[in-house]
């Protein structure tokens, strides 16, 4: 894979602008955990997302699970509900090779780097309630981009990756 082709933060901003997608950006220090992000002054804390990049035990299927920042996903329960093989966190190498991301910067916008459309996205349905906003990293963990949840779903679908909205 040619890493020069991967979209970085500025390229994500340019893409959103070119697609006429409303977004708001909050620049902040690099954050690697939800606890660190809690120390940052963000405008829509209720819309902040936590992302888990997982694969099955055979590394045949990859999933990006996007949930509310204050929630926890039980991977065993998730597996049962979605009829997957046993799940585990994907390796740092897989994260870089497939999504072009480093740990701490996992985001649904990384799907734009998934050239083979390997990753299936699962999105928490609560992001479609209230303001219907979602806050995700722009492929780097030094900012949060706030988008309309429907726009994010459309970005993923238009790229060719499957996305399911469900209660996690």
Task: Show which residues each predicted segment covers.
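Extended, low-hydrophobicity, polar/charged segments
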Residues: 2-168
């Amino acid at each position: 894979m040619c890493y020069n082709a991967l979209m970085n933060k500025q390229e994500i901003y340019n893409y959103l602008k070119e697609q006429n997608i409303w977004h708001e950006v909050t620049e902040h220090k690099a954050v690697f955990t939800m606890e660190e992000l809690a120390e940052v002054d963000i405008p829509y804390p209720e819309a902040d997302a936590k992302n888990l990049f997982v694969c099955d035990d055979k590394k045949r299927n990859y999933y990006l699970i996007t949930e509310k920042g204050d929630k926890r996903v039980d991977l065993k329960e998730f597996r049962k509900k979605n009829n997957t093989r046993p799940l585990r966190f994907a390796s740092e190498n897989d994260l870089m090779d497939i999504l072009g991301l480093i740990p701490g910067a996992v985001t649904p916008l990384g799907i734009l780097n998934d050239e083979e459309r390997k990753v299936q996205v699962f999105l928490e349905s609560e992001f479609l309630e209230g303001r219907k906003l979602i806050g995700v990293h722009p492929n780097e963990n030094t900012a949060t981009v706030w988008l309309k949840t429907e726009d994010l779903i459309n970005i993923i679908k238009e790229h060719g990756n499957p996305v399911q909205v469900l209660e996690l």
